[in-house]
Amino acid sequence: MRSEKEVYDIVLNFAKTDKRIRMVTLEGSRTNTNIPPDDFQDFDITFFVTDMDSFTSDDKWLDIFGERLILQKPEDMELFPAVEKGFSYLMLFTDDVKIDLTLLPLELIDEYFTWDKLVKLLLDKDNRIVKPPIPTDIDYHLQKPTQRMFDDCCNEFWNTTTYVVKGLCRKEILFAIDHMNDIVRKELLRMISWLIGIKQGFHFSLGKNYKFMKQYVPEELWERLMSTYNMDSYPHMWESFEQCMALFREVSSEVACQLDYQYPLYDEKISNYVIRQKKKYGIEDDNK
């Protein structure tokens, strides 16, 4: 595997010798001093260029970065069209180095620096940036919820539990799992993150997908949270679902108490609805 210096040398030497490339930046976790470095970190590189078409019309210039295992061009896909501006190349190389390279036109420079604060300037041929930004992850720090935000999280969680119940009672486990993972679990994790912020402060980030959450919660809570990922049968799905509801109730009640917010009354009503439906339809170990 090439070293970090070797990768930067290849990228910057190429950029310095190509007149179309006027500026180079680095984004993402490699700019964040709060993220422990490891071999899986991508090199998120952006080239600001004078002529986009001359690059995108032929991929041969990418060979300078090494032999690739796979290449993805999100902006060139029909099934998964990209929503971001520019044109990007997601490259995994045979030595396990991963480079996500994006091309942007020069006219987007000012707008670009408003998108994210985790940016480091690597090359500026024309001295366009008077004061290079200092990378910071402040935009990803935990956010103290307002009463309205707290209410919205509770409402989204408890409203969506009715969809999970519907899927389980209809024996549509994929429907139930989808709503459990995409919405119910998402709001549970959000609520847990708020409790962490209340106890630890709102001055740091839990990382993408809450990947550092384990460091900040009691072992008992963590084990209960992990148990909710067992969804391979209807009985297990019911157990995971009920554990999610119990965890959310406990955590959100504590958040409400700590922030002096009103806890929603519909928790009890929806919980009784879930009990009633489960009793009516029962459970069985059937994955069909």
From Swiss-Prot:
Effect of disrupting the coding gene: Loss of streptomycin resistance.
A GO MF label: nucleotidyltransferase activity
Reaction(s) catalysed by this chain's protein: streptomycin + ATP = 6-O-adenylylstreptomycin + diphosphate
SUPFAM superfamilies in alphabetical order: Nucleotidyltransferase (SSF81301), PAP/OAS1 substrate-binding domain (SSF81631)
Classification via Pfam families: Adenyl_transf (PF04439)
Keyword terms, alphabetized: Antibiotic resistance, Nucleotidyltransferase, Plasmid, Transferase
Gene3D superfamilies linked: Beta Polymerase, domain 2, Nucleotidyltransferases domain 2
GO biological process: response to antibiotic
Enzyme class: transferase
The EC number(s) this enzyme carries: 2.7.7.-
Role according to the record: Mediates bacterial resistance to streptomycin, is probably a streptomycin 6-adenylyltransferase.
Further comment found in the protein's record: In strain C179b a 10242 bp segment of DNA has been inserted into the chromosome between cj0168c and sodB. This piece of DNA forms a multidrug resistance genomic island and is transferable among C.jejuni strains.
NCBIfam families found in the cross-reference section: ANT_6 (NF033084)
Protein name: Aminoglycoside 6-adenylyltransferase
